[in-house]
Structure formats: C-alpha cells, structure tokens
C-alpha cells in the first residue's frame, strides 16, 4: 500500500504522487512497471548510483544550481565524459529544433506510447472505467509534470496522429515545468502558436492532425529516443545540434570537465591571437614544455576564479 506522509509537498507534487498511484491501479501487479509506471522503490533501485535527493515520485533530483551550470554545456563537452565512462548511447539528433536560441535543460519525465491495438486497449479502458478513472491520454502524463521537468516522449517516430501537443498543451507544459521543455520522438501541431511560446522543444515533425491511434503504455519508465535509453530523472541538455541524456551520477563530473575544456579553448585562442605559433604548436596539447607549464598555471588560476565566483556570497 502506498502511504502519503505529512511531508511538505506542494499541491502539484501531491497531485503527481496521486496520479502515479492511480495509474498503478490500472495495471497487473506483475507487469505494471513495464506497462505503466515504476513504483518509487523501483525508480530508486534502477537509479541507485545517483548522489542527489529525490523528487516525490522517486526520480533523481539534479540540483537547480547544477542545472543552471548545464546551460553553458556544448555537445562536445558532454561527450568527452560520457564516452570515457562507457555511456556511448546518450545522444539523439535529427530533430526539428523549436526556439534553437534557447538551451534545453531539465530532469527527464518519461512517457511511452505504442501503436493502438484493440484487444490491449479494450482492457486498459475497462480497467480505467472499473477504477472510476478517465481514459489514459497524453494529458494524463502532462498533468503530472513538475517544475524543472523536461517532458520526454517516445511516440515511435509517428508523424500523422503522433502530435503529443498543440499550442494550448505546449503552453501548459511551459507553465507546469517553468519553461523546462519538450523532447518527442513524434510530432507537434499548431506550430504558429507554439512559435510564440518561449520554451525549447525538439520534435521529429509538425502535423495538423490530433494525437490518435496510439496507447499510453508507460510513465516514468525507461524509454527509447532514437538510439538512447532514457531513464526518468536523467539530466536533459539540448542545443542546436541535438539532445544529451546525462545519468545523474555523471552530472557533476561532466560539468567540472566542461570548465576545464572552456579554459583550454580560451587559452588556445589567446595563443593563436598572438600570431606566433602554428596550430600544431598549441592545439590540442602544447609541444613546448614552457608552454605546457604556462597552460597548467593558467588552468589553475582560472579554475580558482570560477569556483570563487560560484561560491555563496
């Protein structure tokens, strides 16, 4: 039995917890984690390496200050750490990028759809009716979003009737997440209206049809976006090139490594500006021992400056 304590949750958090509990009632106990949602304990089990606090639904809660730092990341900086750690399938591209001038950063709230199948769909409808709950739709998941979330949706690349939101629901997602964002392996509709709403989004296509001929089969479970397995609570970082899904346990290391890469690029360009060196003298590693020492001293000084700037006043 799920127990709700007197912990200080805001109304939206309580609503999200209740929605998760309600959806769990619709699924057979042996497979509900596969079909509809992970329990809080299952989320904790599958993300046991994460070092942070957790959201009420059990997802890792990457701290807000680290999410702000992530807005300065580039795809290359994220890749440097992930490939070193053996996470080679964390990047998805090939999207239409809406509002490409805005960086997408937030915690993954994952949603899975599958093509409609009448016998399975009929059972889900019957279970919902018997439980006094409405039919499962895209809005079932959307209404569970919290501030800082990015809505990440596996709609299996569907274009026609694969539109997760139009401009009205896009606006709601923006308000509910605080401008977090949207990534959908599917489509959106009402592009003219969406273009006026200040939230980053990534989709495969734009189509005028409403969502249809699909079944909602998972909320906050592992999903597939392109070649990526996305876990609930992954840090989602998107730029003009594509989207990275960073495991929470690697976020701090990615950010610290990015600082070093920024400083290295800064120093390299300064040396090129002097006009005294060939590219191979400086990049990617200085050949002269004196230049190597100069760089190490520059790196140490700049890291100290950056850390001082970030420390609480």
Each predicted region: which residue ranges?
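Bacterial N-terminal signal peptides
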Residues: 16-28
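N-terminal pre-domain segments of enzymes
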Residues: 34-79
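Channel- or pocket-lining gating/hinge segments that regulate access to a cavity or pore
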Residues: 242-244
């Amino acid at each position: 039995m799920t127990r709700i304590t007197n912990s200080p949750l805001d109304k939206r958090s309580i609503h999200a917890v209740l929605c998760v509990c309600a959806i769990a009632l619709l699924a057979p106990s042996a497979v509900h984690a596969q079909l509809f949602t992970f329990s809080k304990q299952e989320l904790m089990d599958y993300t046991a390496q994460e070092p942070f606090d957790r959201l009420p639904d059990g997802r890792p809660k990457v701290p807000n200050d680290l999410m702000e730092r992530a807005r300065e990341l580039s795809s290359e900086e994220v890749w440097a750490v992930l490939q070193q750690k053996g996470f080679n399938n964390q990047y998805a591209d090939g999207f239409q990028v809406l509002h490409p001038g805005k960086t997408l950063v937030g915690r993954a709230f994952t949603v899975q759809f599958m093509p409609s199948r009448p016998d399975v769909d009929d059972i889900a409808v019957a279970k919902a009716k018997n439980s006094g709950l409405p039919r499962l739709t895209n809005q079932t998941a959307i209404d569970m979003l919290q501030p800082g979330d990015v809505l990440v949706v596996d709609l299996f690349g569907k274009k026609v009737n694969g539109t997760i939101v139009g401009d009205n629901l896009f606006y709601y997602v923006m308000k509910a997440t605080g401008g977090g964002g949207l990534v959908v392996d599917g489509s959106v509709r009402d592009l003219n209206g969406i273009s006026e709403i200040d939230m980053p989004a990534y989709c495969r296509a734009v189509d005028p049809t409403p969502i249809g001929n699909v079944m909602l089969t998972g909320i906050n479970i592992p999903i597939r976006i392109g070649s990526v397995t996305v876990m609930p609570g992954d840090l989602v970082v998107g730029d003009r090139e594509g989207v990275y899904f960073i495991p929470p346990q690697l976020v701090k290391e990615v950010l610290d490594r990015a600082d070093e890469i920024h400083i290295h690029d800064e120093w390299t360009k300064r040396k090129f500006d002097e006009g005294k060196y060939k590219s191979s003298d400086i990049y990617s590693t200085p050949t002269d021992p004196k230049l190597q020492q100069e760089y190490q001293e520059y790196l140490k000084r700049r890291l100290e400056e950056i850390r001082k700037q970030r420390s609480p006043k």
